[in-house]
């Protein structure tokens, strides 16, 4: 009888071990893939589902800047390239297929204004110079935009140092965004939470 009990316990422990391993594997291959930088990847479908529960904030880095590229400028050399404008328009088309209910903001630079304009497909744009200043005060600035938007979703075109700061501050990860890369946050009970990196598709 004792031998049977010991064998049962041993088998049960083995089963528990297998079950635990399966849970881990399932978690890694489920809804959220993970970027190499340690941030969860948020695709359009996941973003749309999140937006049904909370007001979401999507912060994009501007498109390819002209003064750091050999590509043709869209207009002013302090703005973006033609290639960057086309990429912003394509991104906006895909984004708007998943999220339609949002207010659009940008910092007060030519490159962010142009990026947001080409992304927007005619949506009105509000320029806010505070989206250029990125430090601990960025969260209060974002919350102000949410209040102005009456808790609608918010899309902001800003700068790489803003995204880098938020990723480090909220998740402790090093995030070096390329042009038009983005972070997804949501607001709940007056606080902002970083959900991950937006990955179109």
Curated annotation (Swiss-Prot):
Residues 1-35 form the signal peptide. Pathway: Bacterial outer membrane biogenesis; lipopolysaccharide metabolism. This is Lipopolysaccharide core heptose(II)-phosphate phosphatase. Disulfide bonds: none annotated. Keywords: Hydrolase, Periplasm, Signal. InterPro entries: His_PPase_superfam, LipoPS_heptP_Pase. It is an enzyme of class 3 (hydrolase). GO terms for biological process: lipopolysaccharide metabolic process. It comes from Salmonella arizonae (strain ATCC BAA-731 / CDC346-86 / RSK2980). Gene3D superfamilies: Phosphoglycerate mutase-like. It is found in: Periplasm. GO terms for cellular component: periplasmic space. Its EC number is 3.1.3.-. The keyword Plastid does not apply. GO terms for molecular function: phosphatase activity. CDD domains: HP. Catalyzes the dephosphorylation of heptose(II) of the outer membrane lipopolysaccharide core. Transmembrane segments: none annotated.
């Amino acid at each position: 009888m004792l031998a049977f009990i010991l064998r049962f316990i041993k088998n049960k422990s083995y089963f528990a071990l297998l079950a635990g391993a399966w849970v881990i594997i399932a978690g890694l291959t489920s809804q959220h893939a993970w970027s190499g930088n340690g941030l969860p990847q948020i695709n359009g479908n996941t973003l749309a589902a999140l937006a049904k529960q909370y007001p979401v904030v999507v912060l994009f880095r501007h498109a390819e800047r002209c003064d750091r590229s050999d590509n043709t400028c869209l207009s002013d050399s302090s703005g973006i390239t033609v290639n960057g404008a086309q990429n912003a328009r394509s991104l906006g088309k895909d984004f708007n297929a998943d999220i339609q209910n949002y207010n659009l903001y940008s910092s007060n630079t030519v490159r962010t204004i142009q990026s947001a304009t080409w992304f927007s497909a005619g949506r009105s744009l509000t320029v806010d110079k505070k989206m250029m200043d990125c430090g601990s005060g960025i969260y209060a600035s974002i919350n102000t935009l949410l209040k102005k938007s009456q808790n609608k979703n918010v899309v902001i075109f800003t700068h790489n140092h803003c995204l880098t700061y938020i990723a480090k501050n909220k998740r402790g990860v090093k995030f070096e965004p390329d042009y038009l890369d983005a972070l997804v946050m949501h607001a709940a009970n007056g606080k902002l939470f970083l959900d991950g990196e937006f990955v179109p598709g």
